[in-house]
Amino acid sequence: MTKQRILFITTGGTIASVHTPQGLRPVLSSDELLAHLPELNDLCIPETLALCSIDSTDLGQEHWLMMARAIQENYALYDGFIICHGTDTLAYSAAALSYLIQNADKPIILTGAQQPLSNEITDAKKNLRDSVICALDPGSRGVMVVFGGHVIAGTRAKKNKTISYDAFASVNFPELALVQGDRLVRYVPSPWPTGPVEFGRAMNPRVFLLKLIPGMDPGMIPEIFRLYDCVIVESFGVGGIPQRLMDAFAEGLGHYEQTHKVLILTTQVTYEGSDVGVYEVGKRVKNRFRFLEAHDMTIEAVVTKSMWLLAQNCDSFDQLQQRFYRQVNFDTFYH
């Protein structure tokens, strides 16, 4: 049987780092990464593309667009893509690529490591090998995260451990599969494309994430609305916002009503999502504002979906709302 061609796209991160007097620094080239795993040649035809070599905390919208463009330019040449990425912002990149690359009929996998590949004891080799096993499975399609043996939809991944090897969890949705040795045990089928693969070319970075704290001074809220096109509010519980903060939100939205500013409400709680209408404090919000509610979506998905949608120049709030709730790569089950 003909071996499949897999393109490894490297971006830096812990997996490509070595110890220096200044701390871990990503310096390994893409070819040096694969040199640590010669056994991959028995599974596939691995080739490499070095996109950048930076700490993932320095990654942003321009890098997500670079990743999408690199996959677009090589899409016809390879059977699958594995992006080696730092763990700190990997979930953001996975969500962003889920929106920037839709209807993919090939696997696009993000992985990384908690310990550098150059270490004697590391999770990097397992994660890279597991990613190849997942990529070679004929049922693998679209953007996903492979880490610690777990396969997670790109819009549902969240880093919830800073040191442990099982660093990522699937939030409010089952894991897609598990990698057990050379076998992929699938729980959820990958979504079938509804048309030809589509690549996005723009994201609007003017999105602000505001985490509420008890007793927060509302004075900065109108200024936030002045500077940003979309404000995502991490409310308390299922969707509570203090009364004095609501007054500030009303001022901010009212002042910029004609400029299509967007307010999105979500929750600080990782699991089970928001439901603004449950309590009186939430119902006050519903009666006073025009907003989108994130419901079961992860913060990473809400942030990147907002950036993607705002770059599409929706004609009205209703159109934006319709697109926001359209499911992409299992990101939401609210209709």
Please state what every model-predicted region is.
Residues 94-123, 132-138, 255-267:
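Short, acidic/small-residue loops that bind anionic groups at enzyme active sites
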Residues 19-22, 94-95, 120-123, 153-159, ...:
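Short acidic, glycine/serine/threonine-rich loops at helix termini
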Residues 1-73, 271:
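ATP/NTP phosphate-donor binding region
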